[in-house]
Amino acid sequence: MSDFAYPLHEECGVFGIYDRAGTEDVAAAAYSALYALQHRGQESCGIAVNDDGVINGHRDLGLVNEVFTPAVLGSLAKPTAHMATGHVRYATSGSRIRANAQPMIVRHGRGTMALCHNGNLTNALELRRQLENEGAIFHGSSDTEVICYLVTRNRLRMGSIETVSYTHLTLPTI
């Protein structure tokens, strides 16, 4: 069967920028990238900007140009911000509500994290139930919120995000 037998189905778009030199308006760059990626997701969108460790963001239902008015985009533009991430969404899991828009920003005892995710967790419901039994309170219904809780839980247990990443992403040698 040819590759063209199945219709195209776009599922979200994710963008990230790190401007080491500090010469770019990372919020504007994220906006432009999301505008270009908008064909991959027209339900919701969002941008999170890291300004010297302080993460602020905006996300909502709607098209990029509707969600990011000049005033909203201006509030994210910081001359000292060097990082931003953005997301446009078509729901592949979870419902079409503002709480499922990304990036999700999580504040916890050791810092703040913004997370964008494209895809589905095959065991999301099982993980969600386990986390709820441990006290997690979910505000939306997306897999991304499950990932946020898992990363945060392990960050608090292990001390650094680098340790979490290394521990959980390192494949065993055979």
PLM regions and their residue ranges:
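Conserved short alpha-helical segments that host acidic/polar catalytic motifs at enzyme active sites
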Residues: 1-169
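A short, hydrophobic C-terminal helix/tail in secreted or cell-surface proteins
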Residues: 170-174
